[in-house]
Amino acid sequence: MNGNVLLDTTIVVAHFRRDAALTTKLQQAGALYLPLTALGELYYGAYRSQNQAKALAQVHEFFKAVVVLHPGEATADCYGQIKTELAQAGTPIPQNDLWIAALAKEYQLPLAARDDHFKCVQGLNVLNW
């Protein structure tokens, strides 16, 4: 794989836990993008960690290797569309994951994730890494 990829929090956490197969995929990918929402989730996890200093250092180091995507008006529009479609289908997903899916759709990036509920989002290219 050599294409650009948007990373869900689950992928970064697996990388932090030294998932060798995943690390290889990350190394073979093109540009790596991280939603601002996922970065917030990573910081939350680091601050809750028993080894806070090490966890924060991991987040800071990883932050250097990715491009952080920030939500804007177009993201909000995608968010509204996705949330409406999922509500009508009776398949809601967590709030933060709605924002992550919206960024993936807005930027037309495949989303590497380990959460099955992303598959409910129409038109979202989910990579189950």
What is the predicted role of each segment?
Residues 1-34, 40, 44-61:
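Short, well-structured N-terminal submotif of metal-dependent ribonuclease cores
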Residues 16-19, 113-117:
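Short, polar loop motifs at secondary-structure junctions
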